[in-house]
Every structure is written in C-alpha cells, then in structure tokens.
Amino acid sequence: MVGGGVAAFDCSGDGLPELFLAGGAAPSALFLNRSVKAGQLAFEKTLTGVEVEGATGAYPLDVDGDGITDLAILRVGENQMMRGLGNCRFERANEAWGFDGGDAWHTAFAATWEKGADWPTLAVGTYIDRTQEDFPWGHCTTNWLIRPAPGERRFAPGAALEPGFCSLSMLFTDWNRSGTPALRVANDREYYKGGQEQLWHIAPGEAPHLFTEVEGWARLRVWGMGIASADLDGDTYPEYFLTSMADSKLQTLKAGPGKPAYADVAFKRGVTAHRPYTGGDIRPSTGWHAQFEDVNNDCRADLFVAKGNVWAMPDFAEKDPNNLLLQKEDGSFEEAGDRAGVASMATGRGGAVVDLNADGALDLVVVNRFAPAQVWRNSGQGLGHWLAVKPQMPGPNRDAIGAWIEVRAGDMTTRRELTRGGGHVSGQLVPWHFGLADQTEAEVRVIWPDGTEGPWQRVAADGVWVLSPGAEPVAWAP
C-alpha cells in the first residue's frame, strides 16, 4: 500500500550508480549498473547480501565513516543496517553498531550528523499498527530518534518521538540557516486522530521537542507522503514541497527565519498537481515520491512527482500519470510529463531522478506497485551545460551531510542543502547535480556543516568535481 522505494548509489566505483529496489513481500534486490557511459542504460541483478523480504525502502549513507557506502533498509518488521564491504558487498551490522531495528511498519527515514558527533543521528518513522488491520484508524505507531551512544562509535537506544501520526517521509533540514537542523515529518491524515504535520527541535545534547503554534508552526493536515526541498526563490532558505492526495503543497517562509511560519504557494507556482493532466481521469491525484532536480540543465530546479492510487480508492484517480514540472523563467512550473514520455499510468511509489550513464542528463527511475519498475533515459535535445559536485571532508561525516553547495553560473546563483532523507522511502548518494545553461564554467563553493564558508572556486562545466576543505577542486573520474 505504501513504500516501494529505490536507493541509488555507486558501490562499484565506476561512477555509475547502482539501484537497490525494495521488493515488499518479495526479496529486495541490487541491480549493478552496466550502462554504457553516455549511452544505453543496462542493469544486472546480482546477489550482494541485501536481499531481504518485507523491505519498504532504503537510504544510502556512510555510517561508520570508512569511505564505503552503507545502506539503511526500512522494512515491515525489523529494519536492517547493512555495512558496505566494498565492491557492492554488504553485511548485517545491527548488532555491531548497536542498532535496534524495531518491529513495526517502517515508512520514513532521515539522517544527520549533530555538532561534535562522530556517528550519525537517525530518525525512523512508522505507519499504522499491524495488529489493528480491521480498524487501523487512530492506531499510528511511535517514531524514533536514534542518537550516538556517548563516547562510542555505535548507536544508543532510541528516544520516542511522540505523538506519532503515521509518518511517510522525514527530513533533517536547516530551515532557517541557524546551523542546527530540525526534523520535518510528513504524516498521513488518513489514519491519525488529532494529528498534523510536524517540525521537531533537534538540538545537540537536548531532548527532542516539537515546534509549537506559539513559535509560528501552523497546524497543517494533509495526506503527507513525500517531502522535497530546494531554495526556489533565491532567498537562501529552502522551500518544501509536500505530496498528498488531491492538491500538494509548496511552502515558503512568510517573514524570514525568525519563526517557522509558512505560506502555501503551490497554486501560484503551478505545482498543486491535484489531478491527472492526461489520460481522461479527472478524479484527484495521489502523489508519492517528490524530488527537485534540474532535468534540462537550465539553472532552474524542476520537480518530479511519482503518482499512483493507494489501493482501489474509488474517489481518486486510477489513471494517474507521473508529473514532470519544468520551472520557467518567472518561477512558475509547467507540466511536461506527457511530452517527456514519463506519464506512466502504472501505480507509482518511490523514485529517483539521477544520472545513470554519466552524460550529465538526469534520468528517471520509478518503482511501481503491481507492475515492474520503470527506467527512463534522458534523451532530451538542447540541454544546457552541467556540473556535479562531490563534497568530501575528513572525519566521520565524509559526505558532508548538512553542508550547502552554492554555484554561480553567469548571473544565476543556485544552492542546495545536502540532506539524507525525504522523498518517499527513496534515497540517493551521488554527486550533486547543477545545470549551467549556456555557461562553460562556473564558480562553486561549499558551506561546510560546521558553518565554515569555503572560497569561491572556478571549475569547468560538464564534469564531476571533488571539493574538500582547504583544497583546490579536483576533477573526478573513476
């Protein structure tokens, strides 16, 4: 019903991301990327140690800071932390890392590194109580915050994030650029009682607690299924897109960083995505995975939304095509899913917008319910130049989660927050992609997780660059 995620990450070292697909009742699988660089896409299913039943989704991250990607697998039942061994081999690490995988219907995940920590902090979201299948309403289960054990490189027992309101997406995000991320939680109003969307204070050394209406957080009730974030208006603060049934939301800060008070600008921007735009079904849509990426390399973030009916819900569209919303010069978006060829009528869930063949054009993966997953190669004509950034830093947080990347190309400046979480049970660990339009070079800098601002550095377009603190950019090639 929910779940069906995909994780994209390069575990073979060839610069082409592999795909982990959650299998639900069937075993999950890892597909090695055998694509031709800048050519046809091809994948090979391979036994790697991640084949588990009951998987709902997965997120790649380097938990132990050894430079090898690990994988957090969400499941109906016990979650599994899989330690990367190199060459796309994995082993269970729950016991070695002190990770309590729980025994619930797990449907959301996020990770961050708190200040001074040498081990990540995780948030894990759960859905309805599986013992209440006959009457699930009002039976949402507990979410968890899992922090490092003091003085040890392992996890401490989790702290309950209560109340839980049937979470389907989580994201650690520095919403006000304070240097301390908070935790956003998207919740499904179908099953909770008295619930709402949530924003948690997660301050180092302090117990988590919710932002309140007194602090500016307004009650919002949606069928929250996915979160995507991007700075769309150039004010340095992220906007948040929330998928739902019927109209989706696009939230922007009302009056700066003083309080988390948001205005919904989805209608103004043209991203409500509230009903199908092709196929003849006019009932309300159901949105799942969402992701901002520049798919035509014009320096403007576009938006992909995976669509699909929950489970024979007659009041909602059965033929519900995915959205590919291209951002225009005025900041509004226009639908391009039909002419791009991605308006599938399959029942979509998780997804990934990612460069699968190292040609600088972002491709698309969607996991479907009751149908095979779909992969689309980006064969668009007239795409702009591009740049991909691979931040690397010494210490435990090697991939600089919590940093910001800023890119100046001509008179355009774009920025991205480096997060791990969000979407719908689908995560990626790949170089961060920026379109450059007609620019053949750009200036780039990283604002590192501790707030240190790296210098602006000039790099050539159409390549991947490694940025590290105190070092010159290095062109990366496998």
Regions found by a protein language model. Give the residues of each.
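Blade-edge motifs of beta-propeller repeat domains
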Residues: 1, 32-54, 83-104, 121-123, ...
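Aromatic- and Gly/Pro-rich amphipathic surface segment
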Residues: 1-7, 17, 21-25
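Beta-propeller blade termini
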Residues: 3-13, 32-33, 55-65, 69, ...
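Hydrophobic beta-strand segments that make up the repeating blades of beta-propeller
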Residues: 16-23, 68-75, 120-127, 170, ...
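A detector of repeated loop/turn-to-beta-strand junctions in beta-rich toroidal repeat architectures
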Residues: 27, 78, 139-142, 194-196, ...
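Gly/Ser/Thr/Pro-enriched helix-cap/hinge segments flanking short amphipathic alpha-helices
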Residues: 117-122, 126, 152-153, 206, ...
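Short, conserved, GDST-rich strand-edge loop motifs in beta-rich repeat architectures
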Residues: 124-141, 186-194, 305-319
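Loop/turn-rich, solvent-exposed surfaces of beta-rich toroidal or solenoidal domains
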Residues: 238, 242, 249, 287-312, ...
